[in-house]
Amino acid sequence: MLDYDEVTAFLGEWGTFQRLIFFLLSASIIPNGFTGLSAVFLTAIPEHRCRIPDTVNLSSAWRNHSIPMETKDGPEVPQKCRRYRLATIANFSELGLEPGRDVDLEQLEQENCLDGWEYDKDIFLSTIVTEWDLVCKDDWKAPLTTSFFYVGVLLGSFISGQLSDRFGRKNILFLTMAMHTGFSFIQVFSVNFEMFTLLYTLVGMGHISNYVAAFVLGTEMLSKSVRIIFATLGVCIFFAFGFMVLPLFAYFIREWRRLLLAITLPGVLCGALWWFIPESPRWLISQGRIKEAEVIIRKAAKINGIVAPSTIFDPSETNKLQDDSSKKPQSHHIYDLVRTPNIRILTIMSIILWLTISVGYFGLSLDTPNLNGNIYVNCFLLAAVEVPAYVLAWLLLQHVSRRYSMAGSLFLGGSVLLLVQLVPSDLHYLSTTLVMVGKFGITSAYSMVYVYTAELYPTVVRNMGVGVSSTASRLGSILSPYFVYLGAYDRRLPYILMGSLTILTAIITLFFPESSGVSLPETIDEMQKVKKLKQRQSLSKKGSPKESKGNVSRTSRTSEPKGF
């Protein structure tokens, strides 16, 4: 039976057409790098203290001592959520009493910030935190906003594949790109926290949907050898490039509305790609639109300077060229992921693996404001370190076993994060460097986990297995802002938690089967056994009948993109 790759082999693998598709689709991901982690600057919390109204009659001495002091990470700093009772200190000021000399400040009654807060503007002129006072009793709202963005990503993950299967890769790519850009633009005019959060959720839905559509379109149009590079390096590196440019925008534009507008506008420019990116011929064939697919392929041949055959698709073979996804396989359900002890343990381990990697990746990215040093430089470095991480992951996938590659990357990331707490407070650059190395290790693991998981599950439930694992990843990203939030109580706590979880997961990874150089399993019974189950199941088989393989159908071996 013919297949699409054989029929279109005359186009070559890396002609002008393929290069255009590779770079244009990768470039369409750059705006995702802007919005994916824009919360680092949009929801940043500047230094703040209770506002003392100018109308209150206080001497300069009492105005300077109106805020109680507290010890935090060594030195004494003004409290952020309390002040001395204004009526009391105003009375002392009127009587001519001096703070500290005539009045014991530790005995004074305190009150909340009844008149709002004053925010330091050395780094940020405004953020949503300063505009809507999302501090103190409302400090949970800023991480909630970020979590809702990732809730949108979770929802978009569920619908994007179904929409592109029904309406076409190109249509959904540009529709969700418009959704991503449009709601981000409306977000600029948010009048309150609730409106901003709702729109941020919708932005998250468009964000992941156009990412997935671009990924699928590229993998369907590029040859086998090129699509591997596109999936592991192309879209990931261009996302990282957008992430690297984000702090440059933020450095020059320090007011959150103008910054959001600036990082939204490049998405408008991507609309021009409509006239350069064609629909997926594979999808057109699956819909029976053979003539349209031929037109695209002949145009590709012309761009590559190749003369196309007089007949590309033989009508008698048209049905055989349908994607496997268009065939109706025997029904399998989510229950199949826990049907046998082996696949049940593998599924649980995969959920833990994906959840932990996602918490580490997004937690470290969102924790940028809490790092010592310049926030803009730190953000750039955390983005730049992803590029060599992706390259390393690609090399490891080519030459080293999957299990040890994953475990090694996670051990590296987790161990250096645990070392952060041991660094003396005056060695800021060392602690920041360790965080960068931790991000490097976790990013490498994130880049490999899609491939590894897809290879472990059998064809009949592969999409479900990767889908459930990917859902765990989304849940990890939703939780990650609250790992960062814990840093308000102790700056070392996020690193201790993320480092411990990452090392624990690295140990769990060592019990996964090895998939490198092994044929992909087609049925549940063909799956490799999880470590420690091999011996137990081999013994049990001596006294029990083998599991029935049943009638299963073979579906396409697919993998999904790393989701941001």
UniProtKB/Swiss-Prot annotation:
One of its GO terms (molecular function) is ATP binding. Predominantly expressed in testis. The keyword Ion transport applies. The chain crosses the membrane at residues 21-41, 143-163, 173-193, 198-218, 233-253, 258-278, 345-365, 377-397, 410-430, 434-454, 466-486, 492-512. PROSITE patterns: MFS, SUGAR_TRANSPORT_1. Residues 1-20, 164-172, 219-232, 279-344, 398-409, 455-465, 513-564 are cytoplasmic. One of its GO terms (biological process) is monoatomic ion transport. It is a multi-pass membrane protein. It is found in: Peroxisome membrane. Residues 42-142, 194-197, 254-257, 366-376, 431-433, 487-491 are extracellular. InterPro entries: MFS_dom, MFS_sugar_transport-like, MFS_trans_sf, Orgcat_transp/SVOP, Sugar_transporter_CS. Its main location: membrane. ATP binds at residues 218-225. Glycans are attached at residues 57, 64, 91. Belongs to the major facilitator (TC 2.A.1) superfamily. Organic cation transporter (TC 2.A.1.19) family. Sodium-ion independent, medium affinity carnitine transporter. Also transports organic cations such as tetraethylammonium (TEA) without the involvement of sodium. Relative uptake activity ratio of carnitine to TEA is 746. This is Solute carrier family 22 member 21. The gene is Slc22a21.
